[in-house]
């Protein structure tokens, strides 16, 4: 085992190769479900490495996006050092830095079991999970849209308004920033909006794969919820999938989002059994 004389410092662009090796070769690599690759954050001041004798052995990145919400975008460490040692050194630095910048809500979608005890030992709370649902191929009817409402393809020019819809539909912890949406849009396979009198009311953004699609985001302004607008966007997406000869559609949502779960279940989605805990920590 390495001597454990770890020094934590801000990550630098010159660390790119060492970090790439850690991410590629090591068994313990946590990556956030994101539109950006972990090393895209390398120039962020919220990215640190732990090294011994100039050798990078661990890394953590948690840049706030949107402001005030810092997801753990990356945590990885060499198999030559204990996970708890790497985490405690890096998390102590990150927590102190976040506090000095005014604080943040820190979140982790822990897909891998090895990471979860470290978070609980650091007093992270576990208020909810992400659950996966899959459409079972049942035909759906397109709900009638309210008078004056129009469904159309999303364009890049819509993105600032799309970000407004997103912020109006979700709490800050779950909001997608404009920068995130600008990265997501070119990667989408099918994205649509609902508008009335030139104002965007709702949107969906989906990605594609060989067998079907994944509904990555569905948002409806709070004041317009309850009018089956979300159902209309999902029904249109299902129609698009069927027209392309595809048969699979998946979606993730929060385990405690009853409105969302009810919508998807009514439209023929069933839970797959996959579930990922969401841990939170408030840095004041």
Predicted regions and their residues:
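A short beta-loop-alpha structural element at the N-terminal edge
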Residues: 5-19, 150-162
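Active-site rim helix/loop that mediates acceptor-substrate recognition in acyltransferases
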Residues: 23-53, 61, 169-201, 205
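Conserved donor-binding loop and adjoining core beta-sheet/short helix segment
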Residues: 24, 34-92, 96, 204-216, ...
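Acyl-donor-binding surface of acyltransferase catalytic domains
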Residues: 66-68, 78-147, 275-281
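Conserved acetyl-CoA-binding loop-helix of GNAT-fold acetyltransferases
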Residues: 82-96, 220, 226-239, 243, ...
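Conserved hydrophobic beta-strand within the GNAT/NAT acetyltransferase core sheet
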Residues: 106-109, 215, 249-253
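Conserved active-site alpha-helix within GNAT-family acetyltransferase domains
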Residues: 110-129, 227, 231, 255-273
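Glycine/small-residue-rich hydrophobic helix-like segments
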Residues: 181-244
